[in-house]
From Swiss-Prot:
Uniporter that mediates the uptake of cationic L-amino acids such as L-arginine, L-lysine and L-ornithine. The transport is sodium ions- and pH-independent, moderately trans-stimulated and is mediated by passive diffusion. The modification Phosphothreonine is found at T606. Keywords: Amino-acid transport, Cell membrane, Glycoprotein, Membrane, Phosphoprotein, Transmembrane, Transmembrane helix, Transport. This is Cationic amino acid transporter 3.
């Protein structure tokens, strides 16, 4: 009795949502074109990173070799982007990595992914709103901050911000109202701001190459000491590296690349528009690939221009581009760049807010969150309750919190989502086509009979018995992918915590790494020998299983770099989420409701959506 109860409980945690023909139908308005998705991806990705991150990484971690940092980070992001693109073509639904996890690895992992995506978007929205407020305040001479500091102070350091940001609060609430009006209206604003941002960045790149000097990529310690003597400072080699193009060496490039990786976070918001894109199978993969390419070219060009215009050790991390134009004597250009930064932060803010309610909507639609959050406005066809609730929470956090200590927490959620999407692509590529036509019980019975007919042999592991996937080959890949995820996590843990003995050639730890790599290669070989699903898609990840595995390794390795405090905060957030899931979601899940319903066997089982409201509207 106890064993059966535990077995049923375990089945609830790993139950998966089947890919159904009805998943292409939606209650949201299909009004977003490929251009809209590219503008959304570029706007949400090409935000604070290009105006703030470039100066910080160049000065403190990489110097002129920041251009290589962005190249490495772009390659890492492309791996995740390719996986997102295939799933966007295969599963055209709203919810991004949440939905991808649901149809592949099960309900508990799907809830975990969705819950962390909500965390990432809320923190991202609040922090960008504070950055927008600070940039605007700096443009007008810091009058807002000086006034608030003189009247209202929050005396809780490391917990709350120094002062409440009324401007950031109003900004988030204003954009929340814009999103409530409809995706098409907010898409128009996104395209305008993104266009202005690209024009300003184009001006920065061209001006930088005109006014830049190649000698700034060949600086020596003597140049740095001369600058320090002019400012009565101390000449210290540690503070500027060893000079040249790579002043901080290979270690600096890798550390800088890890930071620059987060500058590409944001393209995943494209994947949440599956129910609002006019042609999701084509638009989503194209939007992701094109937006990542544009962002890389912009980051590469701006970082090159920035480090050519002035010595990297003179950069101001808070406002590197305006200060660079002041340094070369182009003072009026400072204000043009400041306006561009406001446009960039505006699109980045909207890009963070856009997917937030749609992930909540998708989870509520599936019953994992409260059903009221899935309510859609009849006039604008937008998830109005989810939009308002998420906007109010983000506005409250922007009002009270500085959020600098929560950036790593946001990154954990994003990297976890990236890793799960890569696992999902790997698993689903090798699964047989399944359609739920005669009820879930009949499908499960058919699967059990098929598995009994198939036998697990050595030949099934290393030789293709069939040219198309079977239930047995699909199960083999599922188990092997789970083992690979565990092994890659252990490998990243060893490489992070036992770096010194590995560098010194300790035979014990070197043997451990070699054994883990051998197991990874062997299990990967088993997956490689299984037949792949041949369903025609507009886009598929090339070189499977290699690229998804590399993506998983990179993401997990970056997660291992987080501090203990960050993991503690992450644990608190997950406790809140699990309380909601086990207290409400597991009993009200759509899949749970299906299991308790008695449906006629002749009736197709699909998602009940109001198709009369899935119309395309424009302005």
């Amino acid at each position: 009795m106890l064993w059966q109860a535990l077995r049923r409980f375990g089945q609830k945690l790993v139950r998966r949502r089947l890919l159904e023909l009805g998943m292409g139908e939606t209650r949201l308005a299909r009004c977003l074109s490929t251009l809209d998705l590219v503008a959304l991806g570029v706007g949400s990705t090409l935000g604070a990173g290009v105006y703030v991150l470039a100066g910080e990484v160049a000065k403190e971690k990489a110097g002129p070799s920041i251009v290589i940092c962005f190249l490495v980070a772009a390659l890492s992001s492309v791996l995740a982007g390719l996986c997102y693109a295939e799933f966007g073509a295969r599963v055209p639904g709203s919810g991004s990595a949440y939905l991808y996890s649901y149809v592949t690895v099960g309900e508990l992992w799907a809830f975990t992914t969705g819950w962390n995506l909500i965390l990432s978007y809320v923190i991202g929205t609040a922090s960008v709103a504070r950055a927008w407020s600070s940039a605007f305040d700096n443009l007008i001479g810091n009058h807002i901050s000086q006034t608030l500091k003189g009247t209202i102070l929050l005396n809780m350091p490391h917990v709350l911000a120094e002062y409440p940001d009324f401007f950031a609060l109003a900004l988030v609430l204003l954009l929340t109202g814009l999103l409530v009006l409809g995706a098409n209206e907010s898409g128009l604003v996104t395209k305008v701001f993104t266009g202005m941002n690209l024009l300003v960045l184009g001006f920065v790149i061209i001006s930088g190459f005109i006014k830049g000097e190649l000698r700034n990529w060949k600086l020596t310690k003597e140049d740095y000491c001369l600058t320090m003597s002019e400012s009565n400072g101390t000449c210290s080699l540690d503070s500027m590296g060893s000079g040249g193009f790579m002043p901080f060496g290979l270690e600096g490039i890798l550390r800088g690349a890890a930071t620059c990786f987060y500058a590409f976070v944001g393209f995943d918001c494209i994947a949440t528009t599956g129910e609002e894109a006019q042609n999701p199978q084509r638009s989503i993969p194209m939007g992701i690939v094109i937006s990542l390419s544009i962002c890389f070219l912009a980051y590469f060009g701006v970082s090159s221009a920035l480090t050519l215009m002035m010595p990297y050790y003179k950069l101001q991390p808070e406002s590197p581009l305006p200060e660079a134009f002041t340094y070369v004597g182009w003072e009026p250009a400072r204000y043009l760049v400041a306006i561009g930064s406001l446009c960039a932060l505006s699109t980045s803010l909207l890009g963070s807010m856009f997917p937030m309610p749609r992930v909540i909507y998708a989870m509520a639609e599936d019953g994992l969150l409260f059903r009221v959050l899935a309510r859609v406005h009849n006039g604008t066809h937008t998830p109005i309750v989810a939009t308002v609730v998420s906007g109010v929470i983000a506005a409250f956090m922007a009002f009270l919190f500085e959020l600098t200590d929560l950036v790593d927490l946001m990154s954990i959620g994003t990297l976890l989502a990236y890793s799960l999407v890569s696992i999902c692509v790997l698993i689903l590529r090798y699964q047989p086509d399944q359609e739920m036509k005669n009820g879930e019980e009949e499908v499960e019975l058919q699967e059990e009979r098929t598995l009994e007919a198939e036998k697990l042999t050595v030949q099934a592991l290393f030789c293709q018995v069939d040219s198309i996937p079977t239930l047995l080959s699909g199960r083999i890949v599922y188990v092997c992918s789970s083992l690979l995820a565990v092994l890659l996590t252990v490998l990243c843990l060893v490489l992070t915590w036992w770096t010194t003995p590995l560098h010194s050639g300790d035979p014990v730890w070197v043997t451990v790494v070699v054994l883990i790599l051998g197991l990874i290669l062997g299990i990967s070989g088993v997956i490689w020998r299984q037949p792949q699903n041949r369903t025609p898609l507009h886009f598929k990840v090339p070189v499977v299983p290699l690229l998804p595995l590399v993506s998983i390794f990179v993401n997990v390795y970056l997660m291992m770099q987080m501090t203990a405090d960050t993991w503690a905060r992450f644990g608190v957030w997950m406790l809140i989420g699990f309380a909601i899931y086990f207290g409400y979601g597991i009993q009200h899940s759509v899949e749970e409701v299906k299991n308790h319903q008695t449906l006629p066997k002749t009736r197709p089982q699909t998602i009940d959506l109001d198709l009369t409201t899935s119309c395309v509207h424009s302005i």
